[in-house]
């Protein structure tokens, strides 16, 4: 199973990107992470025809890190898709997400280079309010 992490700040276009990407990857599952109890992005992705799983009420970079690793292993053991597309909450530190998932990488699970989606029109606002988070996502992505 190849893991694709698509990070980006709130409203950057992660969900739209994942919707288009998942349609190009036949054998893929989407794992949504939302800090809130209601997962809006999960509803937006229903038209992809893909299985969509979610981890809610916390961030996979911190409070949900154990659930995250367990969920990824469970997906590999039960569904075993070719690709697992992960959309972390927009407030997640990509460095911590990578750190949390790296220990479970082995011959059956490969973490591909992370992607960060950036909304050019929001950069000034984000850099003013969330500079550390924004820079973490950019510095830890490959695309």
Protein language model features and the residues they cover:
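Nucleotide-state-sensitive switch-loop elements of NTP-binding domains
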Residues: 2-126
């Amino acid at each position: 199973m190849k893991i694709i992490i698509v990070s980006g700040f709130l409203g950057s276009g992660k969900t739209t990107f994942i919707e288009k990407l998942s349609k190009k990857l036949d054998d893929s599952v989407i794992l949504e992470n939302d800090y809130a109890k209601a997962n809006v992005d999960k509803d937006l992705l229903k038209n992809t025809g893909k299985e969509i799983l979610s981890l809610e009420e916390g961030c996979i970079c911190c409070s949900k890190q154990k659930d995250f690793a367990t969920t990824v292993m469970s997906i590999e053991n039960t569904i075993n898709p070719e690709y697992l597309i992960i959309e972390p909450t927009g407030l997640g530190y990509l460095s911590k997400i990578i750190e949390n998932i790296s220990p479970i990488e082995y011959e059956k699970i490969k973490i591909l280079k992370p992607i960060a989606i950036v909304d050019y029109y929001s950069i000034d606002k984000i850099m003013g309010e969330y500079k550390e988070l924004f820079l973490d996502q950019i510095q830890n992505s490959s695309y």
